[in-house]
Curated annotation (Swiss-Prot):
Keyword Signal set for record: yes
Gene source species: Arabidopsis thaliana (Mouse-ear cress)
Name listed for the protein in its UniProt record: Putative defensin-like protein 235
Keywords attached to this entry: Antimicrobial, Disulfide bond, Fungicide, Plant defense, Secreted, Signal
Cysteine disulfide partners in this protein: C46-C73, C54-C82, C71-C84
Family classification: Belongs to the DEFL family.
GO biological process: defense response to fungus; killing of cells of another organism; signal transduction
């Protein structure tokens, strides 16, 4: 009897876990899976608009074809760290 109870409880718990995983997967953005993230450090600060600063830095480094979709900028003293998404 104990093993049957244990089996039923295990099945119920597994169904809860699997349904939660399906909910999480349904909430994922399929476009986010196609984005590539690149990081680089550049000289100078982020300025007033770090997103534009990082985009300009990546274009200067690799040309117009190297333009990111969006960026985040962090000041590191005399340098700044850019984390950018590319398609």
């Amino acid at each position: 009897m104990r093993s049957a109870t244990f089996f039923l409880v295990s099945c119920v718990l597994m169904s809860f876990v699997l349904s939660h995983v399906k909910e999480v997967e349904a909430g994922l953005d399929p476009m986010a899976a196609n984005l590539r993230v690149r990081k680089d450090i550049f000289i100078g600060g982020c300025g007033r608009d770090g997103n534009k600063t990082c985009m300009k830095d990546f274009v200067k480094k690799g040309g117009v074809m190297n333009k990111p979709i969006s960026c985040e900028c962090d000041n590191l003293g005399y340098e700044h760290l850019c984390r950018c998404n590319f398609s």
